Amino acid sequence: EKREKQLQEWNDIGYETVSHSTVLQAVSVCVNGACSRKDILNKIDKQEFINIWEEIDDDFGKAIDYLKKALGVAVSKLLPYDGLLVPFVYFFHKHPQTPSAIQSKYLKDYFWRCVLTNRFSNALESKLAQDVTHVMDEIIQGNQPQYEQGIDVTYEFLKRNGTFSTGNALIKGLLCLLAGRSPRSFKNDIPVVIDNAWLSQGNSKNYHHFFPK
């Protein structure tokens, strides 16, 4: 019932496509610092889940608001990975206040590192557990996280990995950047409405506002 209410609220703000599993992963990392299937099934009892639900729901709201305003993720279909929402929920669970300027800088850096390195293309659960501990906990303390993997933003990298696909994390990241610049229709110059319905269709005519043929 509470999840249904949450979905109704998320539908109003364009985040209705976030999966049930992402919600469970977020609850688990906030409670246990990990989100494997075993962690979810064996380490969270029913009453604990009920008791923490309202708080986590509020954390989701703060995370979504931040992603919308600071990173241009206007709707959930623009999330490079559904799972990328989880560390941001964890951040706001541990740090309910508005991020400081330095924290916001590191949060944005983390987001783009995930996009440019295809961070969550595999081993999602273990990487989420790593990131809440080694990245988000550091950012909460105002420290710059240390990353093992570098990033590549060369022309060759973008050409090799930038083939248009609605499921491509890099393409979604570029769409976030472009959507934040208030795209307008080539036909009549009215603002382009960005919603999950047309983002789900790879052949949607609206994509030409971003990727002209």
Please report, for each region that a protein language model flagged, where it lies by residue.
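A cross-family structural signal marking well-folded subdomains
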Residues: 5-161
